[in-house]
């Protein structure tokens, strides 16, 4: 959403507060630019701003962005903290007795400039990391793509991360004072009963349309590039990934056989969706001002898409022959203690959203009702994509 559209809507609807959520790494830059635009338009004093999302941290918002914004800017960890902040901001704005904002996060003590320069001096060039290149390459069951539709909720519901849902999406937590029920008690008395009710409703109202398109492709790597090959062994498409400039100097390309080895590796891609109906239902709730119901159903829909992605990644590991290495405990599965990893576009190791167009060209996700917008966003919203890597050392990392 361009900032001009946000500001026009704020003026048209006489908004009290502007809220923005950033999921992707690029969002940190966009948020800063948006706040600077509010400054330039002399609108900062009129609009307090609440920021949140996976790409942002409280320190970044309440330290760095607070320093540049000429109005009030605060961080909300989730939608429920956002609602509490809204109450506080409105109370302060209207002069309600006793209304006040929570304290800003205090700035950390920074190292001296000289020490920081030595510590942060990056290495240059394409110096490869120490990732092993002699791991066995699994044999995929097929090359190309397959479409799977009609996946039942019971098949992937066990992959639903209740902790991420209850804490991250629904804001379920014990009172800060320590009084009242514990988090575990809240899970039993509120979380799981609400979850069961919503899951029953999703099935009764037929709101889920879970589907997957995925595939395996031959590939090699060269420097920071992953080169996907066609059936004749010629280059089909190429992904260029960022490399860490310090530490292990990891790059996603390192997890595939280098071109000079003469060997061919295999890479997986997947796009999953729980369909558009659940998004349409959340939109109805929002339009009817049923905000808590909206937040709960929307949060569940996001986590169900993630559960489907995890379920299908497990299917890929089975097809590649190493599902036996998966941990037995479900919490260890949620902690990603299995072999390999799936990397979604827009995050630290592969931040370039434009690469989604390359995945879309190979998988043709429109076959399961998923489309790519001009801004390289997946629609329906409750959809995810991923590069699936089999290498035993492949784990999440940030290339920044």
Predicted regions and their residues:
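Active-site loops and adjacent core secondary-structure elements that bind or stabilize anionic groups
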Residues: 80-295, 299, 320-322, 355-356, ...
């Amino acid at each position: 959403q361009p900032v001009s559209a946000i500001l026009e809507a704020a003026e048209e609807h006489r908004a009290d507060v502007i809220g923005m959520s950033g999921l992707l790494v690029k969002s940190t830059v966009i948020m800063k630019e948006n706040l600077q635009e509010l400054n330039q338009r002399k609108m900062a004093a009129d609009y307090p701003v609440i920021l949140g999302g996976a790409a942002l941290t409280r320190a970044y918002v309440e330290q760095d962005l607070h320093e540049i914004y000429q109005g009030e800017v605060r961080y909300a960890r989730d939608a429920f903290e956002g609602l509490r902040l809204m109450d506080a901001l409105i109370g302060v704005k209207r002069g309600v007795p006793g209304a006040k904002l929570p304290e800003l996060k205090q700035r950390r003590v920074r190292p001296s400039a000289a020490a920081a320069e030595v510590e942060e001096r990056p290495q240059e060039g394409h110096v490869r990391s120490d990732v092993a290149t002699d791991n066995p390459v699994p044999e995929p069951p097929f090359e190309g793509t397959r479409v799977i539709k009609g996946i039942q909720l019971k098949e992937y519901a066990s992959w639903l991360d209740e902790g991420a849902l209850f804490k991250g999406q629904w804001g379920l937590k014990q009172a800060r004072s320590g009084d009242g029920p514990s988090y575990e008690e809240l899970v039993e008395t509120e979380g799981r009963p609400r979850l069961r009710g919503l899951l029953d409703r999703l099935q009764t109202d037929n709101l889920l349309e879970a589907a997957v398109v995925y595939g395996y492709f031959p590939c090699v790597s060269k420097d920071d590039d992953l080169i996907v090959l066609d059936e004749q062994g010629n280059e089909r498409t190429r992904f260029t990934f960022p490399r860490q400039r310090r530490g292990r100097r990891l790059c996603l390309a390192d997890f595939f056989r280098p071109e000079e080895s003469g060997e061919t590796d295999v890479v997986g891609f997947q796009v999953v969706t729980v369909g558009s109906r659940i998004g349409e239902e959340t939109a109805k709730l929002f339009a009817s001002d049923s905000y808590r119901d909206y937040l709960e159903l929307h949060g569940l829909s996001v986590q169900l898409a993630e559960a489907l992605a995890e379920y299908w990644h497990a299917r890929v590991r089975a097809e590649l022959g190493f599902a036996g290495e998966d941990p037995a405990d479900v919490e260890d599965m949620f902690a990603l203690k299995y072999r390999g990893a799936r990397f979604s576009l827009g995050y630290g190791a592969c931040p370039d959203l434009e690469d989604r167009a390359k995945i879309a060209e190979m998988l043709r996700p429109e076959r399961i009702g998923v489309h790519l917008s001009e801004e390289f966003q997946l629609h329906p919203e409750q959809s995810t994509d991923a590069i699936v890597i089999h290498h035993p050392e492949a784990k999440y990392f940030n290339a920044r």
